Amino acid sequence: LGTSTRDISKYFEREFNTTLSAETISAITDRVLPEITAWKSRMLDPVYAICWLDAIHYKVKDDKGRAVTRAIYNVLGVNKSGHKDLLGMYISESEGANFWLDVMTDLQNRGVRDILICCVDGLKGFPDAIQSVFPETSVQLCVVHQIRNSIKYVGSKHQKEFLKDLKTVYGAVSKDSALAQLDMVDEKWGEMYPIVIKSWRDNWERLTEYFQYTPAIRKLI
């Protein structure tokens, strides 16, 4: 990600009071890179029950020494045996639906034929990118992301009460019950925070996919 072996050597000396030459670091890198390449291209199981897709953003130095933001895209899957496996890590300048389309295509090329449920954030076009490669996959938008995005538009003095009311929606026992609770939240807060309520209604079908499953699976999702 743009950090030279010499810079890494200085970092070890500064942070850990340990001398590690640039040549040694280069030799370690040369040994590790083939293993990383093999891991990234390894064949995967044909079917995964659930996959979580998200990005973590970091500040790194580019080739010119400038501090830039890079995203590491992570795909964590649960196979038919219930085993969790990190299927891939992908680096990009930013998170976008087009890049996720490339990620989905890579998974397909490595042997994945079906994903039952994909859990993702609310990025526009994300579900379409997934279903263009895996058309039968159910896409569940991340409720935590939705809550975080919602609370940004709620006044600080109302946030605690609003979150309590919102919990009756995503914590309901069924989709019908959740919709009834959303109507009540709308009646109470809709005039004050119409953008928030509209966001929940616009994303409703994707936010409530998990209601069709048992409580144990809902908790896992």
Spans of model-derived segments:
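Short, solvent-exposed positions on alpha-helices
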Residues: 6, 23, 117, 195-198
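Acidic/histidine-rich catalytic cores and adjacent linkers
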Residues: 171-221
